[in-house]
Amino acid sequence: MQKNLGAALPSTVWEAARAGQTQQVEALVQQGTPVDARDPEGKTALMLAAMNGHTATAQRLLALRANPALVDRDGLTAAQLAAQRGHTRLVELLEAAR
C-alpha cells in the first residue's frame, strides 16, 4: 500500500499546485514528494502554480526550495509561463527568487 501511495504523490502534488491548494502541496512535499518533480510535459509544481496564478502556492514552493530556474519541455521557466497568462505579480516574485 505504501508503495502505491508513493507512486501517486507526484501527480497529486501537480494537481494540488494547479488548483492552488497550498497546504496540500506543502504536506505532500514534506511527505517526500520531490519539490521539483516533473509532470509528463516537464512542468514542476511551481510552474503549474505560476501559470494558474496561485501566488501563495508559488511562495510556499519557493520556501520549500523549488527551483525557479528550471525549464519545461518547451524551454519555459515558471516566470515565463506566468507571464504568458498575465500574472505580473508572480513574474516579479519568480524573477526575484532567481
Give residue ranges: language-model regions.
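Ankyrin repeat domain, specifically the short helix-to-loop turn at the C-terminus of the second helix
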Residues: 26-34, 59-67, 95-98
